[in-house]
Swiss-Prot record:
Residues holding substrate: C452, M509
Signal peptide location: 1-20
Listed GO MF terms: serine-type carboxypeptidase activity
Enzyme class: hydrolase
EC identifiers of the protein: 3.4.16.5
Entry keyword set: Carboxypeptidase, Disulfide bond, Glycoprotein, Hydrolase, Protease, Signal, Vacuole, Zymogen
Homology family: Belongs to the peptidase S10 family.
Protein name: Carboxypeptidase Y
Membrane-spanning parts: none
Gene3D superfamilies per record: 1.10.287.410, alpha/beta hydrolase
Free-text function comment from the UniProt entry: Vacuolar serine-type carboxypeptidase involved in degradation of small peptides. Digests preferentially peptides containing an aliphatic or hydrophobic residue in P1' position, as well as methionine, leucine or phenylalanine in P1 position of ester substrate. Also plays a role in breakdown of the autophagic body and the autophagosome-dependent protein synthesis. Plays a key role in phytochelatin (PC) synthesis from glutathione (GSH) by cleaving the Gly from GSH and form the PC-peptides of the structure (gamma-Glu-Cys)2-Gly.
GO cellular component entries: cytoplasm; endoplasmic reticulum; extracellular region; fungal-type vacuole; fungal-type vacuole lumen; vacuolar lumen
Length: 532
């Protein structure tokens, strides 16, 4: 069995999860495990009340967690270790320091990159970097903005968010959709299909302690808490750069993976502020985790030959996944009903053991079912090149980074979100609210991804309740022809302002696998009336 570590929509699993089969065996619960967990979660616990509230399925799962990992609960860490800066730059080191009396305790520090040729990344494009500071909580979020190559005074703006939770959006910049990738010699390689071809793109490292972001505190461990920070970042950003929005330019949020959690919540937070200084025009969610209760039905079909690729698992493994599914879904339902850490944590651990670990143990790439995991950093050795590039002193100096060491993903953040119960929560309900407010939404999915696969994404969009759900469900899937390549590049289903797109030959990171078609998708969406 090949040993490696991978993100599962961000979750770091190890090969110790090979014990998953024993989760089928009922065990007695030592009540101390709940008391210990409560202490670690920082929760007051009325044990007798809790035992009455939790159903037997959830209690059995806690018992099995204790049985499989007897030392884990006692040693459990549920907060991020502080990430301290190498050196705080003084006010005079920044071109702009932006505050707003209506947003207490927040400020934005901004620098224009004086000579982009030093970095070799889109040298003819204006670039800004900086930090959002949450002063009373000692949180500092890093961002990097690239103006449109076309007409920044008129083109729309896109905020890009990578998932994880805990992965830097600079991964999106250098690995997927930004102006350059990084070669093995640590030299930038220009990307003709960058999303800033026709839009200004902001890459934001969030939540705190991700990428070049940092905090002297433990940061956040759930999606809702992160939403306020992102909204305030945008308010201050557009205070400083009103030229990006004051002529009626559109603003969009796009992201992938765990951003299927982030984006619905962040968009809801934005729309709740009627006096905001920018207009949220649409959102785009790529290979996201949004409705686990629906999506977890589709790991076995995707792994076992029903997603368009041959099965990667033997029949007995497929049968074991089928056998464990009913219990997995029952645990997710309990999480949906209570949205309590006590129900949601065991749902995540049990279901990821039962539905995801069998595939991972094969050594295949969870982000692309056609490939083996190449080892190294998250199955793609190129990600290590990105880390090495960003850790060079001249790069950190040029972008104003205050953190000594950059890492593409912070697995502590991932763990914190899991143990806050965030993973299995029903964020698709926020999508319902957004659609009912007439916000255009594009859900796209590369069809070679396993971990947030197209089968599950199509399924949840098909059953999502909203004001035109019957009309959407009745629409036929049709071919989508990409404008740049003029080839049939996917299948699309759309009604009014809701669109689902299956992207052929794309993995988890669609812009990495099919860059021309990804840019076609974005251009057609943001410049073509929010339909494909």
């Amino acid at each position: 069995m090949k040993a490696f570590t991978s993100l599962l929509c961000g979750l770091g699993l190890s090969t110790t999860l090979a014990k998953a089969i024993s989760l089928q065996r009922p065990l007695g619960l030592d009540k101390d495990v709940l008391l210990q967990a409560a202490e670690k979660f920082g929760l007051d616990l009325d044990l007798d009340h809790l035992l009455k509230e939790l159903d037997s399925n959830v209690l059995d799962a806690w018992a099995q967690i204790e049985h499989l990992y007897p030392n884990q609960v006692m040693s459990l860490e549920t907060s991020t270790k502080p990430k301290f800066p190498e050196a705080i730059k003084t006010k005079k080191d920044w071109d702009f320091v932006v505050k707003n009396d209506a947003i207490e305790n927040y400020q934005l520090r901004v620098n224009k990159i004086k000579d982009p040729k030093i970095l070799g990344i889109d040298p003819n494009v204006t670039q800004y970097t900086g930090y959002l500071d949450v002063e009373d909580e000692d949180k500092h979020f890093f961002f990097w903005t690239f103006e449109s190559r076309n007409d920044p005074a008129k083109d729309p703006v896109i905020l890009w968010l990578n998932g994880g939770p805990g992965c830097s959006s600079l991964t999106g910049l250098f690995f997927e959709l930004g102006p350059s990738s990084i070669g093995p010699d640590l030299k930038p390689i220009g990307n003709p299909y960058s999303w800033n071809s026709n839009a200004t793109v902001i890459f934001l490292d969030q939540p705190v302690n991700v990428g070049f972001s940092y905090s002297g505190s433990s940061g956040v461990s759930n999606t809702v808490a992160a939403g306020k920070d992102v909204y305030n970042f945008l308010e201050l950003f557009f205070d400083q750069f009103p030229e990006y929005v004051n002529k009626g330019q559109d603003f969009h949020i796009a992201g992938e993976s765990y951003a299927g959690h982030y984006i619905p919540v962040f968009a809801s937070e934005i729309l709740s502020h009627k006096d905001r200084n920018f207009n949220l025009t649409s959102v785009l969610i790529g290979n996201g985790l949004t409705d686990p209760l629906t999506q977890y039905n589709y790991y076995e079909p995707m792994a076992c030959g029903e997603g368009g690729e041959p099965s990667v698992l033997p029949s007995e493994e497929c049968s074991a996944m089928e056998d464990s599914l009913e219990r997995c879904l029952g645990l997710i339902e309990s999480c949906y009903d209570s949205q309590s850490v006590w129900s949601c944590v065991p749902a995540t651990i049990y279901c990821n053991n039962a539905q995801l670990a069998p595939y991972q143990r094969t050594g295949r790439n969870v982000y692309d079912i056609r490939k083996d995991c190449e080892g190294g950093n998250l199955c793609y050795p190129t990600l290590q090149d990105i880390d090495d590039y960003l850790n060079q002193d001249y790069v950190k100096e040029a972008v104003g980074a205050e953190v000594d060491h950059y890492e593409s993903c912070n697995f502590d953040i991932n763990r914190n979100f899991l143990f806050a119960g965030d993973w299995m929560k029903p964020y698709h309900t926020a999508v319902t609210d957004l659609l009912n407010q007439d916000l255009p939404i594009l859900v796209y999915a590369g069809d070679k991804d396993f971990i947030c696969n197209w089968l599950g994404n199509k399924a949840w969009t098909d059953v999502l309740p909203w004001k035109y759900d019957e009309e959407f469900a009745s629409q036929k899937v049709r071919n989508w022809t990409a404008s740049i390549t003029d080839e049939v590049a996917g299948e699309v289903k759309s009604y009014k302002h809701f669109t689902y797109l299956r992207v052929f030959n794309g993995g988890h990171m669609v812009p990495f696998d099919v860059p021309e078609n990804a840019l076609s998708m974005v251009n057609e969406w943001i410049h073509g009336g929010f339909s494909l």
